Swiss-Prot record:
Native source organism of the sequence: Xenopus tropicalis (Western clawed frog)
Span of domain Ig-like C2-type: 18-135, 140-258, 272-382, 402-523, 541-651, 674-796, 806-930, 947-1063
Positions in the Cytoplasmic compartment: 1113-1161
Signal peptide residue numbers: 1-16
Disulfide bonds: C39-C117, C164-C242, C298-C372, C428-C507, C562-C641, C697-C775, C831-C914, C970-C1047
Acetylation found in the keyword field: no
Topology of the protein relative to the lipid bilayer: Single-pass type I membrane protein
Protein name: Immunoglobulin superfamily member 3
Membrane spanning residue stretches: 1092-1112
Locations listed in the record: Membrane
A family per Pfam: V-set
Short motif (EWI motif): ranges: 246-248
PANTHER family assigned to the protein according to its UniProt record, in alphabetical order: IMMUNOGLOBULIN SUPERFAMILY MEMBER 3 (PTHR12207:SF34), V-SET AND TRANSMEMBRANE DOMAIN-CONTAINING PROTEIN (PTHR12207)
C-alpha cells in the first residue's frame, strides 16, 4: 500500500505546471519618470526562493535579447545597462520568494521595448511557462505648469485670486489633475484639487471654507485654473503654488501618474484690519494760464478702501464747490453747477481711493485755495449711514494768469526767384495757439519794388475770404487762391506770375478767444515777411551744343544735344533748329527744326539724314537731341543748333523774344579698325598613304559681324619654295580650283565647317602630295552706303604634310578562353578583331582546330576577302567525322566573327583559334596582303552529362506468413536527365549461409523482360507507378523467399549520333523479408489485430494510473499528523522511479511492466 501511495504522489506531482505572470501591458511612461513592473511565478517545484532574470527586446532588433538585471548573477547585465545597474538606476526588489519588482529610475527614450521576465527552471522536468513579456513605451514629457511669481499683500477679510497654466501635448490619452497648495514654515497644506476623474476635492484644512463658498477652483479656457479665496485670514498667508500631474490608465484599470510638476509660488501676506485713514491732495502744477485745464486729486490712504464708505466734499476759498457720496455721485452748488452744465467743470471718482476735480478753461477769478474733506461713514443697525471720522489735507493755492497770445508766424516761398509766368506760392505757418477754443484770422499784403502797399487777400476767423481791390479779378478767375491746411497753415498761390508781383509779402495772423459774455476777444496779432523776385523770360537765355562721341566709326551712332537754359515750363514757346556743314566743304544748311508747338520739319537738303536720324525734346531736361545712326562719310562735318524764345501775348499772338546760337560741333567718321586675326600655328602632319588629309584655316577674330571673307589655299613644294594657288573660296562663298592645282582637282574639297572655320580636304593622299600648305584670308566689309571694300588681309601658319605608307596595326583578341558544354549542345568560338591598319582594309579568316594526339592543326572553315565562305574537305580517318558539316560561320557585329559547332561530341574537344590576314589597296586600286595575326586559343571541352542517378535507400523490414504476398518499391530519387531511360533488375540474397544472389527479374530500358527462373515463372509482377517508382509484387510466398531483396537501376542516354549508351547505375537493398510458417496462438492473434493490441497492451496503464492517484488523494486527506513527506514507519514516499514498459519491436513478445526502486537523496 505504501508503494501505491508513493506512485500516486509521483503522478500528482508530475501533473503540476509552472506559470510565470507579469504586469499586463502595454505600459506607457513619461521620459524622466520611474516605473516598477511586477513579476511572479507559481506552480513550481524546488526552493521557495525563485530567481528572476529581466531582459529587453528593442524595436530596432525585436529578435535580439539584451540582458538587463538578474537576482542570481551580478554579471548578468549587458554593457549597455551595467552602469545603470551598478549605480542603482535599475534594480530588482524581491517582494517574496516567488514575486519580484523591476525598478527603473529616470526612464530614457531608448528604454522603449518588450521586457521579458524569466525564471530559471528548478523543476525535475520542463513543464509550463518560464517567462512572460510586457511592452513598455517611453513617451516625451510634455506637461507644463506655470504661474507668475509675485508678492501680494491683502487685508484681513479681503479676497485673493491667482491663476495657473497647466497643459500637456501627449500623443496618448491622458488626464490631468491640478492641486493648489500653501507652503508655510516648510509645511505644505492642500487647499483644493481637481482629480484626474474631474472631481473637485478640498484639502482637509479648507473643507469648511469650501462648504461656505470661501474657496473656489475654476477652469478658465483650455488650460487656466483659477483659485479664489474669500474672507482672508492671517492663517491663509504663505507661498501659494499649483501642482499639475499627468495620469494614464494602465490595462489593469489603475491610474498611474506619468509626471508631476509645480509652479512658482505667490507670496501672500494677510495684514490685520486697520480702521485708520489719511487724506492727500495733489495737482500737476500751481500756476496756469487762462483757458488751461486744472486737475486736483483727493487721495485716500487706507486699508481695503473698496470695502469702506468714504464721502468727499470740495471747497474753494472755504466755499463749497461740490460733494460726492460714497458711491461717487456728485452734487454741485450755485455757479459751479452752471459751469458743469457748460462743460467747464467735472467732479468724478477715479478709483476706490482717488476722487478728482477738473476745471476747464480757467479764468483769472479761479485763482485761490482749494481743498477736499473726506468723511468715513458706517452703516448703523438699521442700515442708515453714520459719519465716523472726517479728515482734510492742507490747502493748495492755484494762480490763473490773464489771457495773452503766444502765436508764432513763419512765411516761406517756393522760390525766392520765380520765372515770369510760373506759379508763385507762399506758405504762412502758425504755431502755439492759446487753446482749442481759440480761432485765428489771416491776411496777405504786398509791398512792391516801388514801395507801394497792396492788400492781396484775407480770411476771417469764420473762414470767409475776400481779395484786395487790385486782385479781385484774379480771385474770380482762379488766378489767386488762399488755402488753409488744418488750423495752422495759410497758403497764397498766384498763377501766371507777372513782373508786378515782385516785392515783399507779409502774412498777418490774429488770435481770437471766446469771452465770458459770448463775444470774441482779440488776444494778439503776429506777422512775418518773405521777399520774392520775378525774373523776365529772356533773362539768362542761352544755348549750348554738346556730344560725347566726336569721333565715330562706320555704322556707329552719335548723339548731339542742344541744351537750353534756363529750364522753361511747357507753356513757354521755344523752337530749335539743327544746322549742318559737310566735312568736304560747302554751305551750312538747316537739317531739322523742332517747332515751339512740338512739330518736326526737315530741311530741303536733309538728304540721307531723314532715314537715319531722330529728333527728340525732353520736357524735364530742356534739351533737344539729334540722334544719327549708321554713320558714314556723308554724316561727317560740323553741327550747330539755333534756339528762338517766344511769348504768347494777351491777344493770343506769339512774339519772338530772343534768338541764341550754340557753339559748333565737329563729327569725324572713320572706317573700322581691322581686327582680323588668323591662327598662325605651324605644325607637321604625318599621314598614311590613301587616307584623307584635312587642313583648317581658323579666323580667330574679325572686324565686324557682317564681314565676308575670301580664302586662298596655297602650297609650297618643296617647303620654302614660292606658294602656288590650288583653291579659293571668294566672298560670295563660291569654291573653285586653279591651274596650279589641276592635278589635285579630283581629290580636292573646299568647305566651311563653322563660321570662321574653313577647311581644305585632300582625298587619297599620295606621297607626291607632301609639302607645306597655308591659307591667305581677305576680309571684305560693307560701308553704310551698301558698297563693299577690302578691309584687311592675313596669312595663316604653315602645315607640313608628309605622306607615308600605312603601318601594320592588325590586332586580335589574344585572351585565352575556356568553353565547356554537354554532349549534343552547340558551342560558339569567337574571333574578335580589335584593330586594323586602315578602316577600309579587308580581312580573310581561317578557323583552325588542334586535338590531343594530333600533331598538326586542321582547318575547319575559310572566309575570303570578298566575304565568301569556303568549306574544308573531310580528311580520311578523321577523329570527328562530319565535323565540317556541323560548322557555321557568322559575323554578329563589325570586327567580331563567330564559329558555331552544332551537335557537339566528346571528340570535338580541342583548341580552336582563327588566322586573320589583312589586305590593303594601293592608290592605283590593287589589293595586297599587309599582315596576318593569329587569335588567342579557345579551349573547348565537350563532356557527357554528370551521373546523378540515386536510389532511395529506405529499407522495408516485414514478416509475411507463408502463402501470403508482399510488395517491394524501388524509388529513383534523382536521375541525370529527364529524357534518359531506365533498366531495372531485381535480385534476392537468401538466408542460407554461403548462398549466391539470385536474379529475380531483368527489365531493359524498353520495358522488355528477360526470361525468368522456373521457380519464379508466373509469380512475379512489376508495376511502374511513375517514371521513377517501380514496384515488384510477389504472391504465394514460401519459406525460401526469405532474405534481402536488391534493386539495380541502369540509366541510358541517347548520344548525338542516335546511339544509346549506359551513363550510370545504382544498386540498393530495398527490403528484408521473413516468411513464417502458419501457426495459430494468442500472441499471433493479438499482434495481427491493431485494435486488440492497443486494448491489451496500452489502455490498461492510464486507467491504472488514475486509480492510484485517486487512492493517494484519499490517503492524504485522512493521514495522521506526522512529519511531512513520510509514510508509515517514517519511510519517505517520493523514491519510486517511473514504471518502465518494455515492448517487443516485432510484437512477438508481450510487453513487460517493471517497477524499479530508486535511491533516497
Amino acid at each position: 500500500m505504501g508503494t501505491a501511495a508513493l506512485l500516486i504522489l509521483l503522478a500528482g506531482v508530475s501533473w503540476a505546471q509552472r506559470e510565470v505572470a507579469i504586469q499586463p501591458g502595454p505600459l506607457y511612461r513619461a521620459e524622466g519618470s520611474q516605473i516598477s513592473i511586477w513579476c511572479n511565478v507559481r506552480g513550481y517545484q524546488g526552493p521557495s526562493e525563485q530567481n528572476f532574470l529581466w531582459s529587453i527586446y528593442l524595436p530596432t532588433a525585436p529578435e535580439k535579447e539584451i540582458q538587463i538585471v538578474g537576482t542570481n548573477d551580478p554579471s548578468f547585465s549587458y554593457a549597455i545597462y551595467s552602469q545603470r545597474v551598478r549605480s542603482g538606476g535599475i534594480y530588482v526588489e524581491r517582494v517574496s520568494g516567488d514575486r519580484a519588482l523591476l525598478h527603473i529610475r529616470q526612464l530614457q527614450d531608448q528604454d522603449t521595448g518588450e521586457y521579458e521576465c524569466h525564471t530559471p527552471n528548478t523543476d525535475p522536468s520542463y513543464h509550463g511557462s518560464y517567462s512572460a513579456k510586457v511592452n513598455l513605451q517611453v513617451i516625451p514629457d510634455t506637461l507644463t505648469v506655470s504661474s507668475p511669481a509675485q508678492t501680494i499683500q491683502k487685508v484681513e477679510g479681503g479676497s485673493l485670486q491667482v491663476t495657473c497654466e497647466v497643459s500637456q501635448n501627449s500623443s496618448r490619452h491622458t488626464h490631468l489633475s491640478v492641486s493648489w497648495l500653501r507652503l508655510s514654515e516648510g509645511e505644505a497644506t492642500e487647499i483644493i484639487s481637481v482629480t484626474q476623474n474631474f472631481s473637485v476635492r478640498p484639502g482637509p484644512s479648507y473643507a469648511q471654507k469650501h462648504s461656505v463658498g470661501d474657496v473656489r477652483l475654476d477652469k478658465v479656457g483650455d488650460s487656466t485654473f483659477r483659485l479664489t479665496l474669500y474672507n482672508l485670514h492671517p492663517s491663509d498667508q504663505g507661498d501659494i503654488y499649483c501642482e499639475g500631474t499627468e495620469w494614464i490608465q494602465d490595462p489593469d484599470g489603475t491610474w498611474f501618474p506619468l509626471t508631476q510638476k509645480r509652479s512658482e509660488g505667490t507670496s501672500v501676506t494677510v495684514l490685520p484690519t486697520d480702521k485708520e485713514f489719511n487724506v492727500r491732495l495733489e495737482t500737476e502744477r500751481r500756476t496756469y494760464n487762462g483757458g488751461d485745464t486744472a486737475t486736483l486729486r483727493c487721495i485716500i490712504e487706507a486699508q481695503n478702501p473698496g470695502d469702506r464708505l468714504f464721502a468727499v466734499s470740495w471747497a474753494f476759498n472755504s466755499s463749497l464747490i461740490a460733494s460726492q457720496s460714497p458711491g461717487g455721485v456728485p452734487s454741485l452748488t450755485g455757479e459751479y453747477a452752471r459751469r458743469e452744465d457748460g462743460g467747464e467743470l467735472r467732479v468724478g471718482k477715479d478709483s476706490d481711493s482717488v476722487f478728482s476735480l477738473k476745471i476747464f478753461r480757467l479764468r483769472p477769478e479761479d485763482s485761490g485755495k482749494y481743498n477736499c474733506r473726506v468723511t468715513e461713514r458706517e452703516r448703523g443697525p438699521s442700515g442708515e449711514l453714520i459719519d465716523r471720522e472726517s479728515k482734510r489735507p492742507k490747502n493748495i493755492p492755484i494762480s490763473v494768469l490773464p489771457l495773452r497770445t503766444s502765436l508764432t508766424v513763419t512765411v516761406t516761398a517756393n522760390s525766392s526767384s520765380v520765372l515770369e509766368g510760373v506759379r508763385l506760392s507762399l506758405s504762412c505757418s502758425v504755431a502755439s495757439l492759446a487753446g482749442p477754443q481759440s480761432r485765428v484770422s489771416a491776411s496777405w499784403h504786398l509791398q512792391d519794388k516801388q514801395g507801394r502797399q497792396r492788400d492781396v487777400v484775407r480770411q476771417d476767423r469764420d473762414g470767409v475770404t475776400w481779395a484786395g481791390e487790385q486782385y479781385r479779378e484774379r480771385l474770380g478767375t482762379g488766378g489767386l487762391r488762399l488755402l488753409r491746411s488744418g488750423s495752422d497753415t495759410f497758403s497764397l498761390e498766384l498763377e501766371g506770375s507777372q513782373r508786378t508781383d515782385a516785392g515783399s509779402y507779409e502774412c498777418r495772423v490774429a488770435e481770437w478767444v471766446p469771452a465770458p459774455d459770448g463775444e470774441w476777444q482779440l488776444l494778439g496779432e503776429r506777422s512775418a515777411q518773405a521777399n520774392v523776385d520775378i525774373l523776365a523770360l529772356e533773362t539768362g537765355f542761352a544755348v549750348t551744343a554738346i556730344t560725347r562721341t566726336p569721333g565715330v566709326t562706320y555704322f556707329d551712332s552719335f548723339d548731339l544735344q542742344c541744351i537750353l537754359k534756363p529750364h522753361y515750363p511747357p507753356w513757354v514757346g521755344v523752337s530749335v533748329t539743327w544746322r549742318f556743314q559737310p566735312a568736304g566743304g560747302g554751305d551750312t544748311h538747316d537739317l531739322v527744326t523742332f517747332s515751339r508747338s512740338g512739330g518736326v520739319q526737315w530741311g530741303e537738303r536733309a538728304g540721307s539724314f531723314r532715314g537715319r536720324s531722330i529728333v527728340e525734346k525732353g520736357d524735364s531736361t530742356h534739351t533737344v537731341r539729334l540722334s544719327v545712326s549708321r554713320a558714314s562719310d556723308s554724316e561727317a562735318g560740323k553741327y550747330q543748333c539755333v534756339a528762338e524764345l517766344w511769348r504768347r501775348e494777351t491777344s493770343g499772338m506769339w512774339a519772338r523774344l530772343a534768338e541764341r546760337a550754340s557753339n559748333l560741333l565737329e563729327i569725324r567718321v572713320q572706317r573700322p579698325v581691322p581686327r582680323l586675326q588668323v591662327t598662325k600655328v605651324t605644325r607637321t602632319l604625318s599621314v598614311v598613304e590613301g587616307s584623307p588629309v584635312t587642313l583648317s584655316c581658323s579666323i580667330r577674330s574679325q572686324s565686324g559681324p557682317d564681314s565676308r571673307f575670301a580664302v586662298l589655299w596655297l602650297v609650297q613644294q618643296p617647303s620654302g619654295a614660292e606658294g602656288k594657288l590650288i583653291g579659293r573660296s571668294d566672298a560670295g562663298t563660291e569654291f573653285g580650283t586653279y591651274p596650279e592645282g589641276a592635278l589635285l582637282k579630283g581629290r580636292l574639297q573646299l568647305g566651311v565647317t563653322a563660321p570662321g572655320q574653313y577647311a581644305l580636304t585632300l582625298q587619297g593622299a599620295r606621297t607626291d602630295d607632301s609639302g607645306s600648305y597655308y591659307c591667305q584670308v581677305e576680309e571684305w566689309a560693307m560701308d553704310p552706303n551698301q558698297a563693299w571694300y577690302r578691309l584687311a588681309e592675313e596669312t595663316s601658319g604653315l602645315t607640313e604634310i608628309r605622306v607615308r605608307p600605312p603601318d601594320a596595326n592588325l590586332q586580335l583578341d589574344q585572351l585565352p578562353r575556356n568553353v565547356s558544354a554537354l554532349e549534343g549542345q552547340s558551342v560558339t568560338v569567337t574571333c574578335h578583331v580589335l584593330n586594323r591598319t586602315l578602316p577600309d582594309s579587308r580581312l580573310s579568316l581561317e578557323w583552325l582546330c588542334w586535338r590531343a594526339g594530333h600533331m598538326e592543326r586542321r582547318g575547319l572553315a575559310r572566309l575570303t576577302v570578298d566575304g565568301v565562305l569556303g568549306s574544308v574537305e573531310e580528311e580520311p580517318g578523321d577523329v570527328a567525322p562530319g565535323l565540317p558539316s556541323r560548322v557555321q560561320v557568322s559575323q554578329p557585329s563589325l570586327g567580331l566573327y563567330a564559329l558555331t559547332l552544332r551537335g557537339t561530341e566528346v571528340r570535338d574537344s580541342g583548341t580552336y583559334s582563327c588566322l586573320v590576314q589583312e589586305w590593303l589597296r594601293d592608290p592605283r586600286g590593287q589589293w595586297y596582303r599587309r599582315t596576318e595575326e593569329r587569335s588567342g586559343a579557345t579551349y573547348v571541352s565537350v563532356r557527357q552529362p554528370d551521373p546523378q542517378l540515386q536510389l532511395d535507400p529506405s529499407l522495408l523490414n516485414v514478416s509475411v506468413m507463408e502463402g501470403g504476398h508482399f510488395d517491394l518499391d524501388c524509388m529513383v530519387s534523382s536521375r541525370s536527365r529527364p529524357d534518359s531511360q531506365l533498366a531495372i533488375s531485381w535480385s534476392l540474397q537468401g538466408t542460407s549461409r554461403g548462398a549466391e544472389p539470385e536474379t529475380l527479374l531483368n527489365v531493359d530500358r524498353s520495358g522488355v523482360w528477360a526470361p525468368l527462373a522456373p521457380r519464379w515463372e508466373g509469380r512475379l509482377q512489376q508495376l511502374q507507378l511513375s517514371p521513377t517508382l517501380f514496384r515488384l509484387h510477389v504472391p504465394r510466398v514460401g519459406p525460401g523467399d526469405s532474405g534481402n531483396y536488391t534493386c539495380l537501376v541502369q540509366e541510358w542516354l541517347l548520344g548525338p549520333r542516335g546511339d544509346w549508351y549506359l551513363l550510370a547505375q545504382d544498386e540498393a537493398v530495398i527490403g528484408w523479408i521473413r516468411v513464417q510458417r502458419k501457426e495459430s496462438n494468442l500472441q499471433s492473434t493479438i499482434c495481427a489485430n491493431d485494435a486488440l493490441f492497443y486494448l491489451v497492451f496500452f489502455y490498461p496503464f492510464p486507467i491504472f494510473g488514475i486509480l492510484i492517484i485517486t487512492i493517494l488523494l484519499v490517503r492524504f486527506r485522512h493521514r495522521p499528523t506526522g512529519k511531512p513527506g513520510e509514510g508509515k514507519n517514517g519511510v519517505p514516499l517520493l523514491w519510486i522511479k517511473e514504471p518502465h514498459l518494455n515492448y517487443s519491436p516485432t510484437c512477438l513478445e508481450p510487453p513487460v511492466l517493471s517497477i524499479h526502486p530508486g535511491t533516497i537523496d
